[in-house]
Amino acid sequence: MASPVASHSCTSALLFGNANFYSRIHHIVHRHFDLRRNLNVTILNRLAIVLPFIFFTVTTTAQDSLTIDYLLDRMETQQLKRNDFFIDGIFPSYISGKRKFKTRKEDNTIFYNALIVYTLKDDCHKFSIEQKIICDSIISRSMRALSKFKNRNRPTYNFWRTDTSFRFPYNSLLFGPKKTLPDDLDDTVLGLMMLNNDDSTKAAHALMQAYVNSNPPLKTTYKVYSHDSAYSTWFGKKMPVVFDVSVLCNVLSFVEKNNLQWTTADSASLQLIVKTIQRDDISKHPLFVSPYYGNTSIILYHLARLMAIKPVPALEQLKPGLVALARERVQSSNNMLEKIILTITLLKWNENPPVLNLTTNDVRDIETNDLPFFIGNIPSYFKQPWKEDFMGLRLLMYYHYCPAWNDCLLMEYLVLKQQKSKKFETNETFKR
């Protein structure tokens, strides 16, 4: 049996007798900590480079993200902006004689308020509580301003104020400073849809029946449309009858939204719209068949808005061709505002248009886009062939702009895109 002393000596020899043992252990430990220290330094150096980039990217994305909240706030800010020229509650709008936003002059009109309220009322049920508060505030201010544009004797409305005299916004040397235009069906139906007043709605619809093409053949349009008994754009007795398919879409939207009984004039107006589509005049001659909007894409937008209320069989039959036309134009257009209008149109038809990658950086350019949504078209009253000649040369035409309305269109696109995404997610969940 080995003695304890001998055992201890063996252990000592193993531990202390080997001169390289501690040296090797020390080297391994030292190298391990060196590697960890170097690794930590490398990681920290890389994080120092990467973290600011990540932070910048996240911050930039957050800043640039285009949201419904951002656009509603921008619209309300424009409505609340105080100015000696603009009526309280009116969205600032402008006129240009050169189809250039930068050459604009200020204009007071209820038209864009009515368009914005129409859109907000359509979309408000999709808004959050906070968004609805802003939406309701915009609508309330617009309704207070609306009274300044109402006819004193009947439930009709004017593009410009009726409560006081004002300088005619177009060429005063040509038309005179006190010249004004009669009330029109477009502002009337859009204004009445702001109010939701059943009595005024029915009274206005009854009044409209007297303002149709009752003395054919009409000299302000092509012969093929000259015997149609559709609505004129104007209420004025001294004004010639002027057809505009976009205005007629708004009138029929008014009829459909209020569940009014269709009249002979309503049916004749629908038939005129159908004919302009079948003859492809909405594509070949948009300024002639829609003189106050004058753009194929904007005509398509009006058609889609009407058809989104409830199916109109005569238009549903033509829908495939309309969709194809909208798709063709959204691909060929280089104008971002026009692309937005066409994308909204396709979404209203439950189609899948190309996604528009937009940020807050694009908003200013969209607000000041040179595409006019509405045109003050003096030659529209002229008889043929003078009408077509003057419009072909773009003489006596005035282009109307409203940055807040462009924001509203952008907001409408976001709402519809969001709704489309939710439907897709719901369908995918159901499939699973």
Where are these regions (language model features)?
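Hydrophobic h-region of N-terminal signal peptides that target proteins for export
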Residues: P52-T60
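Long, hydrophobic, well-ordered secondary-structure blocks that form the structural core
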Residues: H205-T221
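Sec-dependent signal peptide cleavage junction
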Residues: T60-L66, T426-R432
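Hydrophobic topogenic segments
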Residues: M1-P4, H8-T42
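Buried hydrophobic core positions in alpha-solenoid tandem helical repeats
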Residues: L71, M75, S142-L146, M208, ...
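An edge-strand/N-cap motif at the start of beta-rich repeat modules
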Residues: Q63-F91
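An alpha-helical repeat/solenoid feature that recognizes helix-turn-helix modules
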Residues: D64-L66, S93-S137, N151-T201, S226-A268, ...
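Sec-dependent signal peptide recognition
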Residues: I43-V50
